């Protein structure tokens, strides 16, 4: 996003041992690099934008993002790890990784949820889609309860987007980028994305409902 923390930067991940030995020196070298690059102005960092770029420790990065440094989750762990964090650590591109330690963890995560976890999540999303979208949204609109209808519609949209990501075996990103990212998915992404956009723009229009 260009709204914040955007500008020339990159990440260099080191093992814990290398980070302790050469981390400080590499951090100084990174800070000494030109702040602008090919016409892009210097990165404007928000107060909480630190430790996102530069020289980082592999273990600390994964532990901060997903709670573990090895990605060896139990079935319960897979259920509760924040999905947007899984999206964060699997998006983007790794340019060079001759050691392979960083990419090995990333590849485990890119393999996606264990199938039992994926099916459980899909069943949960379908249940909410049915109750919030097919049932309660229509009931609220017929009664003219637009605030309650908007809540139901939001639940339906969130769970529908999540379902499409699960069908594509891709992690759903932070809510600001969910819809835009869904449009790029090969299975139902563009089709469902268009319907959701139309629903979001017209979903609480009382003129379209018989509220008697």
Where are these regions (language model features)?
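A generic structural motif
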Residues: 14-19, 143-147
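Ligand-binding pocket scaffold of soluble enzyme catalytic domains
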Residues: 9, 40, 145
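Conserved NTP/Mg2+-binding pocket subregion across the NTase superfamily
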Residues: 19-142
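Conserved nucleotidyltransferase catalytic core and NTase-mimicking acidic/glycine-rich helix/loop elements
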Residues: 87-212
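Generic detection of long, well-ordered alpha-helical segments
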Residues: 16-23, 206-211
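Active-site nucleotide-donor binding segment shared across nucleotidyl transfer reactions
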Residues: 1-17
């Amino acid at each position: 996003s260009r709204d914040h923390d955007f500008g020339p930067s990159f990440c260099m991940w080191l093992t814990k041992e290398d980070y302790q030995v050469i981390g400080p020196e590499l951090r100084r070298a990174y800070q000494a690099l030109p702040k602008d690059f090919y016409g892009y102005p210097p990165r404007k960092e928000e107060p909480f934008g630190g430790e996102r770029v530069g020289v980082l420790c592999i273990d600390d990065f994964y532990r901060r993002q997903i709670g573990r440094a090895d990605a060896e989750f139990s079935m319960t762990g897979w259920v509760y790890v924040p999905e947007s964090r899984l999206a964060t650590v699997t998006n983007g591109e790794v340019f060079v990784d001759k050691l392979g330690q960083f990419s090995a963890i990333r590849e485990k995560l890119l393999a996606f949820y264990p199938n039992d976890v994926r099916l459980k999540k899909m069943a949960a999303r379908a249940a909410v889609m049915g109750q919030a979208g097919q049932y309660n949204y229509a009931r609220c609109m017929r009664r003219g309860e637009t605030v309650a209808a908007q809540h139901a519609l939001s639940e339906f949209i969130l769970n529908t987007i999540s379902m499409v990501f699960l069908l594509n075996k891709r992690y759903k990103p932070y809510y600001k980028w969910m819809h835009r990212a869904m449009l790029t998915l090969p299975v139902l992404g563009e089709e469902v994305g268009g319907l959701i956009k139309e629903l979001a723009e017209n979903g609480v229009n009382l003129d379209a409902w018989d509220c008697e």
